[in-house]
Amino acid sequence: MTSQLHKKGEAWSARFSEPMSELVKRYTSSVFFDKRLALVDIAGSLAHANMLAAQKIINADDLAAIERGMAQIKGEIERGEFEWQLDLEDVHLNIEARLTALIGDAGKRLHTGRSRNDQVATDIRLWLRGEIDRIGGLLNDLRGALIDLAEQNADTIMPGFTHLQVAQPVTFGHHLLAYVEMFTRDAERMRDCRTRVNRLPLGAAALAGTSYPIDRHAVAKTLGFDGICANSLDAVSDRDFAIEFTAASALVMTHVSRFSEELVLWMSPRVGFIDIADRFCTGSSIMPQKKNPDVPELARGKTGRVNGHLMALLTLMKGQPLAYNKDNQEDKEPLFDTVDTVADTLRIFAEMVAGITVKPDAMRAAALQGFSTATDLADYLVKRGLPFRDAHEAVAHAVKICDDRGIDLADLTLDEMKQELPNVAHLIGDDVFGYLTLEGSVASRNHPGGTSPDQVRAAVKAARAALAK
């Protein structure tokens, strides 16, 4: 009997009395994006074929033919010679058709005991597992670049902000290490997500399992999975692992976006804390002086793109009854684009961070504005017995006086300070000015998690050790 796969183009066409509409073919075909799964599809098929042979479901000659044919197909794909056909719907049927053309009936036996439902679920998990590992490495590269820059700036003082208002002095190294913490958690989330990705769906078949005496654990071991999906319906129908990865990716991009916002602000001429290397910037077609931080700006925009993919996948799954539905074909493009966006962003950011020029004088000048050591003066009074709320009120009064005069707290003489703060004058001595310096302020935060240079250097050492694990 002539194979329906080669007679009409569809693997299922014998059931139907008329050919599929060309419009429907174009609408339902996924081959021109899911061909990205081709190499993992081949890997999954080879593991499946070896299991079928071991279980005496196919013979050794069939297995040898399948392995020979798949080797040729893999080479054609890698060389860009494989001819993808819209009529064959997807990556799976394109490869199967080519295999059958090369080796004959043995190619038709490969699909014994499986469905495209468990096949594609396996492909996605195999592919995503590798991409998670790649993204983990890129996160480590970015963490390493930030750690290096933090170490170089353990003593560089800048203003810390709340509400974008000057709050307290911090070291630039401490500020950068905050992002190291964020990206470290991102890496942990990726590793955690991988444990749920790394389960084998193959063997679930269409939805109920198969009547053949398959060995799912052998296939899982061959493909490097930690175990098998325990329920066949769940194995083929849920994409929560893809949603979880995309959610973790959205957090990666959220942290990138926050960092990007600061880079843009820091590079602006009115702030001037840093300069980004020319190779990461662009100019203007009309304004000759412009140097635009397009990379961080675009990263902010791409964060919305990944957030959109997360919402798309959540919406995709929310209304589906068990088991597999064609809706799930729509999981791949958001997933593929999320991987590409995150990977490209992390790669370029690691390189860009390594090329940042820091301007310590501008940072220091900004930290001297906005009464950034006011809290230190309050703490000084508290350490001399004044309740904190009373100290807070007294210093707020002093700030108002200095603001009206256009000077900083440190610009007051000792006599002026006592005169303006008569209620606490007896607590103020010559040593107060040491508390009002930027260096004294940051040095006093000398505890784990604090901004002092010594703590920054200790945190750098710990971060490097964590990165090496």
Curated annotation (Swiss-Prot):
<dbReference type="InterPro" id="IPR029419">
    <property type="entry name" value="Arg_succ_lyase_C"/>
</dbReference>
<comment type="similarity">
    <text>Belongs to the lyase 1 family. Argininosuccinate lyase subfamily.</text>
</comment>
<dbReference type="GO" id="GO:0005829">
    <property type="term" value="C:cytosol"/>
</dbReference>
<comment type="pathway">
    <text>Amino-acid biosynthesis; L-arginine biosynthesis; L-arginine from L-ornithine and carbamoyl phosphate: step 3/3.</text>
</comment>
<dbReference type="InterPro" id="IPR020557">
    <property type="entry name" value="Fumarate_lyase_CS"/>
</dbReference>
<dbReference type="GO" id="GO:0006526">
    <property type="term" value="P:L-arginine biosynthetic process"/>
</dbReference>
<keyword id="KW-0963">Cytoplasm</keyword>
<dbReference type="GO" id="GO:0004056">
    <property type="term" value="F:argininosuccinate lyase activity"/>
</dbReference>
<protein>
    <recommendedName>
        <fullName>Argininosuccinate lyase</fullName>
        <ecNumber>4.3.2.1</ecNumber>
    </recommendedName>
</protein>
<dbReference type="Pfam" id="PF00206">
    <property type="entry name" value="Lyase_1"/>
</dbReference>
<dbReference type="GO" id="GO:0042450">
    <property type="term" value="P:arginine biosynthetic process via ornithine"/>
</dbReference>
<dbReference type="InterPro" id="IPR000362">
    <property type="entry name" value="Fumarate_lyase_fam"/>
</dbReference>
<dbReference type="Pfam" id="PF14698">
    <property type="entry name" value="ASL_C2"/>
</dbReference>
<dbReference type="InterPro" id="IPR022761">
    <property type="entry name" value="Fumarate_lyase_N"/>
</dbReference>
<keyword id="KW-0055">Arginine biosynthesis</keyword>
<dbReference type="InterPro" id="IPR008948">
    <property type="entry name" value="L-Aspartase-like"/>
</dbReference>
<keyword id="KW-0456">Lyase</keyword>
<dbReference type="InterPro" id="IPR024083">
    <property type="entry name" value="Fumarase/histidase_N"/>
</dbReference>
<keyword id="KW-0028">Amino-acid biosynthesis</keyword>
<dbReference type="InterPro" id="IPR009049">
    <property type="entry name" value="Argininosuccinate_lyase"/>
</dbReference>
